[in-house]
């Protein structure tokens, strides 16, 4: 199973919903977000706005591949400015019925497919209004851009004391997909320039990505 995240322009949401319905992909949730590409990059890609929709879905291995293929064919994911998508492998699911629901009726989760983790998803949780600080740090280490979600921290007071920052505030969640070779440098730069000891108060971690679409423009030729 994979947890799929797709970042698209607002006018593509209906088509993406149709793809999910056609493939019978359950548990699709759409959230409003914004891109972080700098103006020169937006001009290069022909992007007029940073407004985005982030769609979260769950799908098995085969459906994930078909989903990515349809994104490329139908939404032109891979063409600059049309969006990106990535999938994170799910290690476990609570309950056999839920597993069957998410995995086309199959409850056997013993098979673990082999993945080539060429990319990783970097997640940085920072104080509200500090996205630019985080992204400037990330770009200094080679990141091309990211997607921002707005939220609120819910951590206990004990965690606040441990980290030395206030967690129960408005937060920005910055999602950055990067090549695995760049991941350590990007995370190190964020921690140094925007980490827990700074005004940004960023906490950063990464997870492997099993499938991607829309990142070919960054590939070396």
Protein language model regions, located:
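Positively charged, small/polar-rich N-terminal and surface patches that mediate targeting and assembly
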Residues: 1-221
